[in-house]
Every structure is written in structure tokens, then in C-alpha cells.
Amino acid sequence: MPRRGAVPKREVLPDPVYQSKVLTKLINQVMLKGKKSLAESIVYGAMDIIKEKTGKNPLEVFETAMKNVMPVLEVKARRVGGANYQVPVEVRHDRRQTLAIRWLTNYARERAGKSMKEKLANEIMDAAAGTGGAVKKKEDTHKMAEANKAFAHYRW
């Protein structure tokens, strides 16, 4: 943590094709070893596949997927009197977005075979339909928060 006050958040520029800041964040998450042009081709390729398969605006499908994956609650470890409690806390909007994008890309990478474009497109379409690994991760996170509701009074 810095001693000289809070570090300002860097503003993300909207992507050149869809003019969406969230899509830029997805591109940055997909990017490995600084290869941004490759990450852009993967994401835009996935968007083309989504448009081809669904016949809908790919940005709307992506936004639906994001809504279905963004968690409302998560658990944080809190140490009280020698015991660690999993305390449920609400998730801020920017963290919701970050977690959703991270889960989408991670579960897309874990999918079997094919190119990353196809895997990402399939994960986004599954998330928009309410299925897929990323949606399951959100549901598991919510179940953990629900199971530990008794420790909610330890919030800070």
C-alpha cells in the first residue's frame, strides 16, 4: 500500500470496433505475454462466431453473459479469536466485472480442443444461456456466502 495516498484508477479506453470498455477489459484479460493484437483477434473472432451462431448482436450476448456471471456476494476470510471465518461480503461493481471477465476467460481456456476463439465464443454463449463453467463458479460463490450467512455480523 502506498504511503502517499490512494493511487488513481487508470481509465480503460473503449475498444475500436464495438466502443465498449468492458470488451477492452476482456481483451486485456485474454492477452498473454503482452500480445495484444493476438488477444484482439481472438476476442473479435469469438464475437464473429457468436454473431454467426446466434444471429444476434454479439455485444448484447456478451453483456447478457456478463450479467449472468457477475457475483453479488463473495466470502472473505476474517480471523477472530484464533479462528478463521468465511465472512460473506457484497462485491463492488468494478470487482464484479473483473471477476466475471476472469472467470469467463479461465473457463474458456479450460475447455477441450478447438481454437481459443471458439472456446471463448462457446463459453460466452453458454454464460448468456445461464450454463457453463463461469456461471457454475458464480453459483458456487453464492452458495458459499449463503452457507456462511451466520458469520455476516463479522463484516468490516
UniProtKB/Swiss-Prot annotation:
<protein>
    <recommendedName>
        <fullName>Small ribosomal subunit protein uS7</fullName>
    </recommendedName>
</protein>
<comment type="subunit">
    <text>Part of the 30S ribosomal subunit. Contacts proteins S9 and S11.</text>
</comment>
<dbReference type="InterPro" id="IPR036823">
    <property type="entry name" value="Ribosomal_uS7_dom_sf"/>
</dbReference>
<dbReference type="GO" id="GO:0003735">
    <property type="term" value="F:structural constituent of ribosome"/>
</dbReference>
<dbReference type="GO" id="GO:0015935">
    <property type="term" value="C:small ribosomal subunit"/>
</dbReference>
<dbReference type="GO" id="GO:0006412">
    <property type="term" value="P:translation"/>
</dbReference>
<dbReference type="GO" id="GO:0000049">
    <property type="term" value="F:tRNA binding"/>
</dbReference>
<dbReference type="GO" id="GO:0019843">
    <property type="term" value="F:rRNA binding"/>
</dbReference>
<keyword id="KW-0687">Ribonucleoprotein</keyword>
<keyword id="KW-0820">tRNA-binding</keyword>
<keyword id="KW-0689">Ribosomal protein</keyword>
<dbReference type="InterPro" id="IPR023798">
    <property type="entry name" value="Ribosomal_uS7_dom"/>
</dbReference>
<comment type="function">
    <text>One of the primary rRNA binding proteins, it binds directly to 16S rRNA where it nucleates assembly of the head domain of the 30S subunit. Is located at the subunit interface close to the decoding center, probably blocks exit of the E-site tRNA.</text>
</comment>
<dbReference type="InterPro" id="IPR005717">
    <property type="entry name" value="Ribosomal_uS7_bac/org-type"/>
</dbReference>
<keyword id="KW-0694">RNA-binding</keyword>
<dbReference type="InterPro" id="IPR000235">
    <property type="entry name" value="Ribosomal_uS7"/>
</dbReference>
<keyword id="KW-0699">rRNA-binding</keyword>
<dbReference type="InterPro" id="IPR020606">
    <property type="entry name" value="Ribosomal_uS7_CS"/>
</dbReference>
<dbReference type="Pfam" id="PF00177">
    <property type="entry name" value="Ribosomal_S7"/>
</dbReference>
<comment type="similarity">
    <text>Belongs to the universal ribosomal protein uS7 family.</text>
</comment>
